[in-house]
Amino acid sequence: MMNQDTLPNLYDLSLAEMERLMTAWGQPAYRARQIFRQLYVNLVDSPLAMTDLPLALRERLVAETRLAPLAPEQVHVADQGLTRKALFRLENGVLIESVLMIYPDRATVCVSTQAGCGMGCVFCATGTLGLLRNLSPGDIVAQVVWAAREMRRFAAERCISPSLAPPDDDSWWTPDTLEDQGSSEARSISVSRLSNIVFMGMGEPFANYDRWWRAVEILHDPRGLNMGARSMTVSTVGLIPGIRRLATETLPINLAISLHAPDDALRSALMPVNRRYPLAALLEATRDYLAATGRRVSFEYVLLQGKNDEPEHAAKLAALLHGEAGTTPLPLHLVHVNLIPWNPVPGMPLGRSERRRVLTFQRILRERGIACTVRVERGVSIAAACGQLAGARGLNVEC
């Protein structure tokens, strides 16, 4: 019997690679398109369910390939069922987490690109694990397939008719509010399928760039899940080579950069990566990215009580983005700041900014002409919010 670990994972294969496999097997190329459709449109979990294929081909797929859909070991639910965090155990035993967030007009899945993370940001639960391993393209794609299946079940339960395609727009930008939308949101749901992907789960995508980008191309393929490029967002701690590489890619993926501090001393204390890629170099790379793409960039800023949330921090951040601190000025019409009140992580001696401080910080930035919103929170009670994913039961916040 062949070792299952050495067999090709169907979720790892692009359509072109699947066509080459079929050709090598003496099959017509259109068989690959049938398989691709079964995987990403019909969302089957076994080659035997691909009933438009000859039985002999289905049996060969079972024998000579792997199809490893993710089945969660745990699913935690919050926000009246509109936020769902899944804990998955991968084939080699490591744990990762994904979060599905359902809104009235869209459904977004937050997926992991690594098991653990080696960036060591002091406010993030994932960083406490260290880097366990990079995820394969198939590991990343399988998380999205899980979310697509969840949305199919959700729509069926609510008798929502499927929409034809996900929005290819800027709907990932967060609403300008801190208010809990509550039960009215649950009643007004009309979305029926997965529409957005954010690569903001466990890990640093640009530290696993090649595998992450292969997953992006598979997810974008119009013959499969057909996720619009502008419906996908990648978040980085500021790995400059990745930012520069993304600027050259043909798919216009949205970019979010974790900033979290307005000066090098504070940012280095919060984010060790700043010692390698300090703010001046990061802003220069951001300016070059904006010039090359013309696409908006979001700066994410986690607010920590008494550490980076004072009015003087907001003023320094505004000066930084305006280029008044000896750094590269940015075209502010292409810049957005996303404020994120810190979400608690057990054992971390940090505090969450008060609402008053959050709104003051936002006001100062807006008065300087900087677009700024506060992220609407989801899943805090189940440790599914920003910075809380740890891929381990012991670090989860109990409901």
UniProtKB/Swiss-Prot annotation:
Disulfide cross-links: 110-386
Instruction: Note the Gene3D superfamilies from the entry.
Output: 1.10.150.530, Aldolase class I
The principal localisation class reads: cytoplasm
Question: What does the record give under GO molecular function?
Answer: 4 iron, 4 sulfur cluster binding; metal ion binding; rRNA (adenine(2503)-C2-)-methyltransferase activity; rRNA binding; tRNA (adenine(37)-C2)-methyltransferase activity; tRNA binding
Q: Where is this protein localized, as stated in its record? A: Cytoplasm
Misc. remarks from the entry: Reaction proceeds by a ping-pong mechanism involving intermediate methylation of a conserved cysteine residue.
What's this protein's function?
Answer: Specifically methylates position 2 of adenine 2503 in 23S rRNA and position 2 of adenine 37 in tRNAs.
Q: What is this protein called?
A: Probable dual-specificity RNA methyltransferase RlmN
- Report the source organism: Roseiflexus sp. (strain RS-1)
Per the UniProt record, the lineage of the source organism begins with: Bacteria, Bacillati, Chloroflexota, Chloroflexia, Chloroflexales
